[in-house]
């Protein structure tokens, strides 16, 4: 089976599970009814097209028609779209580029913000509520532990490179070097102006 249909089917299943399961989200979903959102991930040659209908969202790899809105961003930016307060900041910083009707992406972000992404709800039909909650807690704890471990290792490597091995300058050394370079540049400019004045006489 080709990779692209497998990815689109997985994303479609995930979005439908979280965005179309709860009846409480019906009003938020109705704002997207009939809209087409194209998501282009920088670094990948293909894009994902989200077609919203009353009962589900279809995720397609190809779409012949025009999209109501096109979102262009790196893959690392897409998870930040769950928080609707970050949308404006992402657009202003240039991390997220929006072409077309911005209302479509705003409504999608609002819907994603309202939806509760809880892995325990996915596991509950198969394992029961208590086991699903325990597994979910263990997964969250493991992810947090892993995240802190990675951050700690990054800090250790950065300190080793700058302090112990002296392979790279520290932040204060870089700032000092930048100030000294700017001072030399100003002195050269002043000297050049003085020489030009002397040559003009």
UniProtKB/Swiss-Prot annotation:
Disruption phenotype: During aerobic growth, mutant is impaired for ubiquinone biosynthesis and for growth in rich medium, but it does not present any defect under anaerobic conditions. Residues 15-112 form the SCP2 domain. GO terms for cellular component: cytoplasm; ubiquinone biosynthesis complex. SUPFAM superfamilies: SCP-like. Its main location: cytoplasm. It comes from the Bacteria. One of its GO terms (biological process) is ubiquinone biosynthetic process. InterPro entries: SCP2_sterol-bd_dom, SCP2_sterol-bd_dom_sf, UbiJ. One of its GO terms (molecular function) is identical protein binding. Pathway: Cofactor biosynthesis; ubiquinone biosynthesis. The keyword Methyltransferase does not apply. It is found in: Cytoplasm. The keyword Cytoplasm applies. Coiled coil: none annotated. Belongs to the UbiJ family. Component of the Ubi complex metabolon, which regroups five ubiquinone biosynthesis proteins (UbiE, UbiF, UbiG, UbiH and UbiI) and two accessory factors (UbiK and the lipid-binding protein UbiJ). Interacts with UbiK and forms a complex composed of 2 UbiK subunits and 1 UbiJ subunit. The UbiK-UbiJ complex interacts with palmitoleic acid. Required for ubiquinone (coenzyme Q) biosynthesis under aerobic conditions. Binds hydrophobic ubiquinone biosynthetic intermediates via its SCP2 domain and is essential for the stability of the Ubi complex. May constitute a docking platform where Ubi enzymes assemble and access their SCP2-bound polyprenyl substrates. This is Ubiquinone biosynthesis accessory factor UbiJ. The gene is ubiJ.
């Amino acid at each position: 089976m080709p990779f692209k249909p497998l990815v689109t089917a997985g994303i479609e299943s995930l979005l439908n599970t979280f965005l179309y399961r709860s009846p409480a989200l019906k009003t938020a979903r109705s704002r997207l009814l009939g809209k087409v959102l194209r998501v282009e991930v920088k670094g990948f040659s293909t894009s994902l097209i989200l077609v919203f209908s009353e009962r589900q969202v279809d995720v397609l790899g190809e779409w012949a028609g025009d999209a109501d809105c096109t979102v262009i961003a790196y893959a690392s930016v897409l998870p930040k779209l769950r928080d609707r307060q970050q949308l404006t900041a992402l657009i202003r910083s240039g991390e997220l580029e929006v072409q077309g009707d911005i209302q479509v992406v705003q409504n999608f972000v609002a819907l994603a913000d309202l939806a509760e992404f809880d892995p325990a709800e996915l596991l509950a039909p198969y394992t029961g509520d208590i086991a699903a909650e325990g597994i979910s807690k263990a997964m969250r704890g493991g992810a947090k532990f892993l995240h802190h471990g990675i951050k700690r290792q990054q800090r250790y490597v950065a300190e080793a490179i700058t302090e112990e091995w002296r392979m790279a300058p520290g932040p204060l050394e870089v700032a000092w070097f930048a100030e000294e370079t700017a001072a030399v540049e100003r002195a050269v400019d002043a000297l050049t102006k003085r020489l030009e004045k002397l040559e003009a006489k």
